[in-house]
């Protein structure tokens, strides 16, 4: 991998909100050797290759904390309907696009047809470009749960298990498949015929068995938990990342605050907002979605995240991209929502995407900031996202993405294997 010094950068290390003018990052064999002011560069770099950033913004790679790389940018009822070989090609393409968008890490919240594990292995082997992927498999849910057919899913998209021992067996099968993540549905979705939010679809006994079995086998547990009841159930039994958490009561907020050093929350609000704005393209007009409660869900989510922010609970960026109305590569839209809807500063939103997302994605603490000794995962941006967070949505502004000390450019081209257009 060799060594490289990136200099003359506006450097956002990601530990806090500080930006270092005329900053530098020294990368050596895939790790950060130094980050700070150019004037503080240690001796020994005189003969190292240098890259002049020309004042560009250098920041840690971001984490997509609720990813579905097997989603194929289609209607929700047509997700993952393709034959396995085509689905795998889609997933490979989606991994490239996510990395090219500045996301160097990702936490899977469900993968159809068992695509995640071979995808992760190919990325780790350097065969294809993609983010560091905490891989899952099919969604785990009970009979009649949201996993059991809200969008017409078949067995390629779900594992249905009822009772503690059936759940343990299912999780053991996921461990055998070498998954990193177990995704469990604890309640439902407003579009669900059987399980709307607030209707718990697993008992406490079942959730306790799931979390215990997963943790024994070195896997983490992420949940679909929209209601306060489902959030409290997740906290009680020690899950690792809670997806959605739209409706929170005082007790749920207090429980999350008490466990804020152990549990992360990923609101994944893009689905609700885009469903309201563009649902008519899916045959789901806005007034019908408002009647289903989606506008209320957006309003409740905004209130919930503001309360979590006040309680210093770590809130993560990402969620449910990969539909035709939320295609892969638009994931940075989440940071705009964090600023415009949740009231965060641009630097707070960026810390959610980098520092906090990295802590959730890699429990060894090796990603999320540009501190010495960590993996050299960074993004070079032509412009300052602290002045306009929307810059990160403009792929032409993502000049380069480094992962493991390897610089990737032109990943967003339709064919990234040819020289970029001048």
Language model: regions and residue ranges:
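Active-site mouth loops of central-metabolism enzymes
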Residues: 76-89, 150-169, 220-222
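Metal-associated gating/positioning segment near the N- to mid-region
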Residues: 56-125, 143, 205, 237
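C-terminal cap of metal-dependent C-N hydrolases
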Residues: 9, 13, 20, 353-355, ...
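His/Asp/Glu-enriched, well-ordered alpha-helical/loop segment
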Residues: 216, 286-289, 299-384
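Active-site metal-binding motif and surrounding structural segment of the metallo-beta-lactamase
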Residues: 39-59, 84-85
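Divalent metal-dependent hydrolysis catalytic cores, especially in the metallo-beta-lactamase
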Residues: 90-116, 130-139, 179-192, 220, ...
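N-terminal metal-binding scaffold of metallo-dependent hydrolase/deaminase domains
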Residues: 1-44, 58, 385-389, 406
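Active-site core of metal-dependent hydrolases
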Residues: 188-299, 316, 321-323, 342-344, ...
């Amino acid at each position: 991998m060799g060594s490289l010094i990136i200099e003359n950068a506006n450097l956002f290390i990601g530990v806090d909100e500080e930006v270092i003018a005329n900053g530098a990052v020294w990368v050596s064999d895939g790790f950060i050797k130094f980050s700070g002011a150019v004037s503080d560069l240690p001796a020994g770099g005189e003969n190292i290759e240098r890259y002049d950033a020309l004042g560009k913004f250098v920041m840690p790679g971001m984490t997509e904390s609720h990813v579905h790389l097997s989603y194929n940018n289609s209607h929700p009822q047509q997700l993952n309907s393709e034959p396995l070989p085509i689905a795998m090609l889609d997933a490979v393409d989606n991994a490239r696009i996510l990395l090219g968008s500045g996301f160097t890490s990702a936490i899977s919240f469900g993968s159809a047809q068992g695509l995640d594990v071979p995808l992760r292995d190919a990325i780790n082997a350097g065969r294809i470009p993609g983010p560091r992927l905490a891989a899952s498999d099919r969604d785990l849910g009970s009979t009649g749960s949201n996993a059991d057919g809200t969008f017409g899913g078949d067995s390629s998209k779900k594992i249905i298990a009822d009772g503690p021992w059936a759940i343990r067996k299912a999780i053991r099968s996921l461990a055998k498949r070498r998954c990193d993540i177990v995704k469990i549905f604890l309640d439902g979705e407003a579009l669900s015929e059987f399980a709307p939010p607030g209707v718990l679809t697993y008992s406490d006994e079942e959730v306790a068995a799931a979390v215990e079995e997963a943790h024994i086998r070195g896997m983490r547990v992420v949940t679909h938990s929209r209601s306060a009841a489902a959030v409290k159930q997740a906290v009680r039994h020690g899950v690792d990342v809670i997806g959605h958490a739209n409706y929170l009561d005082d007790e749920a907020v207090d429980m999350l605050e008490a466990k804020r050093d152990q549990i992360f929350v990923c609101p994944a609000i893009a689905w609700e907002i885009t469903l309201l704005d563009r649902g008519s393209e899916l045959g789901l007009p806005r007034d019908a979605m408002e009647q289903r409660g989606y506008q209320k869900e957006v309003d409740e989510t905004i209130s919930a995240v503001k309360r979590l922010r006040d309680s210093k609970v770590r809130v993560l960026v990402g969620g449910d991209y990969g539909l035709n109305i939320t295609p892969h590569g638009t994931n940075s839209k989440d940071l705009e929502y964090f600023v415009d809807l949740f009231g965060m500063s641009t630097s707070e939103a960026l810390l959610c995407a980098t520092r906090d997302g990295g802590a959730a994605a890699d429990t060894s603490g090796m990603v999320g900031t540009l501190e010495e000794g960590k993996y050299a995962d960074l993004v070079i941006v032509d412009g300052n996202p602290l002045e306009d967070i929307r810059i990160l949505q403009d792929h032409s502004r993502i000049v380069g993405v480094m992962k493991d000390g390897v610089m990737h450019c032109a990943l967003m081209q339709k064919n990234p294997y040819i020289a970029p257009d001048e």
